[in-house]
Amino acid sequence: MTASTAAAVVASLGLAVGAAGCVSFYEIPVEIPLQAKIDVSQFQRVLVFGFLAGGSNAIDPNTETARLLRSQLRSKQDLKVIDSDVVSLVDEVDRRQAAAGAMAPAPAGGPLVKGEPKIKTDKDLQNYQAIFSDKEFWKAIGERYQSPLIITGSVLFSEMTKSGMVSKPQQYVDSTGQTRYQEVHEWADLKGYALDSKFIFIDGRTGEQLYTEPLHEESLYPATQNTPALSSYFELMDKVLPSFLNTLSTQKIRGTRILIK
C-alpha cells in the first residue's frame, strides 16, 4: 500500500466514524521504560573518582562534574556513593611522567600560559587518555575502596562562538488593530559553551572497562547576552544526566498518547 493510498483509507475511515457519530480525542499519560545499559547488581558501592578535565578555565569541570554526579547518584539509584577527594587525572598523569623521567605532554596550542588548563582540545586529551587502559591502576583503586564500580572519564567545557540564522518572535498590529506575533529569521552572532564528556565505567575488581558513554552538548546565546559559565555548565549537564543515569538504572520517559473515543 502506497502512502497516498494509506492516506485515502485513513480519510475514508475518519469520514465513516464521523458519519456514525461524534468523535472525541483524548490524551492519556504513558511511561516508556529504558533498560539500564550495564548490570550493576554485583556492586554495592560506586566511586566517582575524577576526570581528565579542561577546555575553559572559567570553571573547574573536574570538581563540578564529580560533585554533581555524586549528588545525582545518591538521589537516583541504590548504590552507596563513596565520599572521597576528587582526583585530577591530569595531575596523576603528570606525576607518572615525572616519575618516569619523561616530559609532561605539551599542549597542542604551544607553551602553556600560567593558569590555563593543560587540556584545551581533543588533541591535548589524546596525550592523557592512556590512563584509562591501565587495568592495574584501576584495580589498585578498586582494592583501596572495597571493589566498587568506578566512574571516571573526561570533561571538556569550552567557550565557542558562531554566526548564523536565528528565529525570534516579532510583534505587529494587524488590519483590525489586534496585536499579533510572527516568527522572523535574522542573522546573529552567537556565543556560548560546548560540553564534551565521556563517562567511563570501570569494574573495581578487575580494572576493566565495562562501558563508555561519549556525549556532546552545546548552548548558544546572543553575543550581547552575559551568561555565567557555571550557569551554562549546569544547563548542559541537565541534558547529559538522563543518559548518564540510564547507564546504571532503568529510566522512564514520560509522554502522552492520543486516543479516539
Model-based region annotation:
Residues M1-V10:
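Bacterial N-terminal signal peptides that target proteins for export
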Residues R45-E159, G204, E208, T212, ...:
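N-terminal segment of the mature soluble domain
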Residues C22-Q44, R144-Y145, F157-K261:
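C-terminal/domain-edge helix-coil "capping" segments
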Residues A11-L15:
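Cleavable N-terminal export/targeting peptides
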Residues V17-G21:
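C-terminal motif of bacterial Sec signal peptides marking the signal peptidase cleavage site
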Residues A3, P29, G50, G54, ...:
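Generic alpha-helix detector with strongest preference for long hydrophobic helices that associate
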